[in-house]
């Protein structure tokens, strides 16, 4: 696959949604140790609903992928009114802004989406790299994708590079001191443990990868 067409966008995100449904219990168990225990529910409900939302919004978007993502992200936010839900929907909307007017996603466009997504999460969550959050997997993914795309990599190569960087980002959180939420209160328990938010970010990239490289 060298590009993703407008009509394929719901299926692209169905790949993400299906993965989060599969990983729901795993994420909830991880989150129960150092968070609220609802991470898997939020991600599976939000991304699980996204393909149908996109199909409903497709006519109004009139072939504009950016518009479709912005409208769908807005609707998704009302379905998952939680901190992570708002971060995800904001990321999708910001990623959509970067693709405004696009009718297909090639390697540079995918990079623009990932960069916009990470920027949206950072803006909404007011987080920085190294604070043990989802940002620690999605920012390296976007940066690696950008580097690969600028070097002329294909769509599949770009998402593969992004996935590898996200995985490395997750691994790096084992040595980070948490700043937010319950994890910050129980910081000692986090040592040597992957951040569950970063894992969720990795799964987001993995879901995209599974579709693009199938």
What are these regions (language model features)?
Residues 1-214:
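N-terminal loops that bind phosphate or other acidic moieties
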